[in-house]
Amino acid sequence: MNRIALYTGSFDPLTNGHLDVITSAASICDELVVGIGAHPSKAPLFSVDERAALIDRSCRDFLKERSCRLSVQPFFGLAVEAARAAGARILIRGLRNGSDFDYEAQMAGMNAAMAPEIRTVFFVASPGVGHITATLVRQIAAMGGDVSHFVPQPVLRALEAKSKTDG
């Protein structure tokens, strides 16, 4: 049986916290679809195409070692509809703290009501990454701070390149 899971987020940028969830998800599925939420009204740091390339470069090799195929695609609208379109029966969510759990448990309940065939699986953040958020990474990087402990190398290089062109 081909187990397909969908992990959605903005991934702007991809962080080591996201990688932690992706690594955990790879242990329970044969194919992981990373769905990049595309919101036309928001002004992201990286375009959807840039984020997709960064996710691919950051994840492809280590997922191959785990026999998990990776695909990255944008999605608009509801995560359960994106899961259905991808053939996924599992939604992956990461939890950093109790606040995340409260929100994600409500979302899982709503998703189950809309799509009972799709299950939500939660992965609790590893101790070393529970404090990382993409918002804080963007803010620290914008102020010239060192984010090397918070993002994978391809993302770090992209942030550095962006700061040179924007600064």
From Swiss-Prot:
Any single GO molecular-function term of the entry would be:
pantetheine-phosphate adenylyltransferase activity
- Which positions does UniProt annotate for substrate binding? S10, K42, A79, R93
Give the pathway listed in the UniProt entry for this protein: Cofactor biosynthesis; coenzyme A biosynthesis; CoA from (R)-pantothenate: step 4/5
Organism of this sequence: Methylocella silvestris (strain DSM 15510 / CIP 108128 / LMG 27833 / NCIMB 13906 / BL2)
Its name, as the record gives it, is Phosphopantetheine adenylyltransferase
Q: Which UniProt keyword terms apply here?
A: ATP-binding, Coenzyme A biosynthesis, Cytoplasm, Magnesium, Nucleotide-binding, Nucleotidyltransferase, Transferase
Query: Which cofactors are reported in the record for this sequence?
Result: Mg(2+)
What do we know about how this protein assembles, alone or with others? Homohexamer.
Gene that produces this protein = coaD
Record Gene3D superfamilies:
HUPs
User: What does the record give as the function of this protein?
Assistant: Reversibly transfers an adenylyl group from ATP to 4'-phosphopantetheine, yielding dephospho-CoA (dPCoA) and pyrophosphate.
Q: Which GO terms describe its cellular component?
A: cytoplasm
